[in-house]
Amino acid sequence: MEEQREALRKIIKTLAVKNEEIQSFIYSLKQMLLNVEANSAKVQEDLEAEFQSLFSLLEELKEGMLMKIKQDRASRTYELQNQLAACTRALESSEELLETANQTLQAMDSEDFPQAAKQIKDGVTMAPAFRLSLKAKVSDNMSHLMVDFAQERQMLQALKFLPVPSAPVIDLAESLVADNCVTLVWRMPDEDSKIDHYVLEYRRTNFEGPPRLKEDQPWMVIEGIRQTEYTLTGLKFDMKYMNFRVKACNKAVAGEFSEPVTLETPAFMFRLDASTSHQNLRVDDLSVEWDAMGGKVQDIKAREKDGKGRTASPINSPARGTPSPKRMPSGRGGRDRFTAESYTVLGDTLIDGGEHYWEVRYEPDSKAFGVGVAYRSLGRFEQLGKTAASWCLHVNNWLQVSFTAKHANKVKVLDAPVPDCLGVHCDFHQGLLSFYNARTKQVLHTFKTRFTQPLLPAFTVWCGSFQVTTGLQVPSAVRCLQKRGSATSSSNTSLT
């Protein structure tokens, strides 16, 4: 019966997953139908606009060329008409001289003949007919204004839709996730010299496998990529995976997106568990601030709840002006809250295997600050590093400045400048807990031990504040140092 029940549960789970996939696909099909209508209307509108632009351009060219013909015809007509008028006048003058010369020749016996002959000779010399060019000033040939649009007609006949770039193919073998950076590499299935740039889109997700259509996280867009690879830097991996897709663009149009891929982005994510914190610590997600009145405010509220001390605080009293620490639900319960001089707060995520890395930046003016790890069983009165259940690096700015590594109430003074940002690397299976200058990755100290219980990130602060950064991968520099064995030293054995 139990086996049948378990088999039925598996069937139900399989059906539920399949139903979700089908629903997602139905949503995709409906969205595609809407997109087909919208996109076809858009491209039809664009096509009509392009042809209208061509019609307008051809009409403008036609008007301009007709105007050129009309201007050339008017200019030639004007020149020929002027030349015709001049020739007509010259011909009339020449005919008059010819008639006069014939008449004078017939009157050779007249005593006026010599004088008349001389006048005719002088008239011929000055006659327009002998100064007139008998070559037309312009040609009647209009061949320079003829056109042959055969080539252009062929070009118009060759009009077609733009060639769309092929969808790129993302090369998972060459892509890399490391140091909170993602290098994505892709290639084109066919050589295309007209590609101008690429567009990369990515988003965070907690779901493995093909990207889902309905996601809470939006696609982030990077445009103008000229190469077939791109590196995203300075990422915070606060989700388990990232989706990626790429499309190619030429000068006019973008192609289809590549098949989306999902890359795993392993990193250690946790928040501070406010329910474990000392009452003098004001906890807000990943930051902590010392609150000297925190405990007193809680005591006042507790008495008011019990019906004791119902007298209201003065309007300007610290108790009224200081808010209580922010609380978060946790399995530890209120009874396990750190108290007395253990100004401690723990992370909310257990470390029970693998390698993990996080960083913490503390206020340099803090009188005391500590960072490390602890077993969940760390007592509520116990301070970090003073029991066998915790390991930490401790900075003390009160009275005398000190920078120490602490475990099981043993202390090692560190001979190194105190950085304002510390990196913590925990390799659970190897039993290594290393502290680094987060900026330079200089090793400050390494505990080498054997962890017998799951660990929690642990922090302590007195009269100060700090900010934790999670979602970080183990830096490559840290891995290299660990492989070379330079992260350990014989002097650390006394604190294991």
Curated annotation (Swiss-Prot):
Keyword Cell cycle among record annotations: yes
GO molecular function terms listed in the Swiss-Prot or TrEMBL record: identical protein binding; microtubule binding
Protein name: Fibronectin type III and SPRY domain-containing protein 1
Span of domain B30.2/SPRY: 268-477
Residues in COS domain copies: 105-162
Effect in UniProt of substituting S317A: In mitosis, remained associated with microtubules
Subunit structure: Oligomerization is required for binding to microtubules.
Coiled coil: 4-99
Fibronectin type-III domain sequence ranges: 164-268
Role summary: May be involved in microtubule organization and stabilization.
Region spans: Disordered: 301-336
Residue positions, PTM Omega-N-methylarginine: R310, R320
